[in-house]
Structure formats: structure tokens, C-alpha cells
Design a protein with these regions (language model features):
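Long, terminal "pre-/pro-" and other extracytoplasmic accessory regions
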Residues: 1-84
Length: 84
């Protein structure tokens, strides 16, 4: 018997999903305190890639945790701290 595969247009259809995935992959890399202290996370769609990043007050040094996620496949393209 052939197995049916359901094809979805976008694995990451909205900002809420992108943020959930972004936080999930950033937590093991940067730690719970670092990631959660940068809430609220923001997700911006840039072409076919979700750019997920945290908030950091303007007077703070360093960068925020960032993740780039393919909208169609959900593949993590890059995780970085966005530091200068």
C-alpha cells in the first residue's frame, strides 16, 4: 500500500511559528537566561526566510540572538548572536 504524503505550502506559515522555532533552536546555543531576557522576540519575513531576533535596549553592548529559518521547509539556515 502506498503511503500518502501531505505537502504543505509553508512549514513556517507565520511569525508566531517562526518565533517558537527560533527560541527552540537558540536556547541550547545561548542559554535560557540570554534568550528569554531578550523577549519579546520579533520575526520578520525577508523573502522566503524568517529572521527571528530578540529585543535589546539601545544602551546595551553586544548583539541579540538571531535565527534565520526557511519559510517553506522550516530548515534552520543560521544561528548567530548578531554581535558587532
Amino acid at each position: 500500500m502506498a503511503r500518502r504524503t501531505r505537502v504543505y505550502k509553508d512549514a513556517v506559515p507565520d511569525a508566531r511559528t517562526a518565533i517558537a522555532i527560533g527560541e527552540a533552536v537558540m536556547l541550547p546555543v545561548y542559554g535560557r537566561h540570554q534568550v528569554l531576557s531578550q523577549r519579546p522576540q520579533v520575526a520578520e519575513l525577508q523573502g522566503d526566510v524568517w529572521y527571528v531576533h530578540g529585543y535589546q535596549p539601545p544602551i546595551s553592548a553586544g548583539g541579540t540572538a538571531e535565527a534565520y529559518i526557511d519559510k517553506h521547509t522550516g530548515r534552520i539556515l543560521c544561528i548567530t548572536d548578531g554581535g558587532e
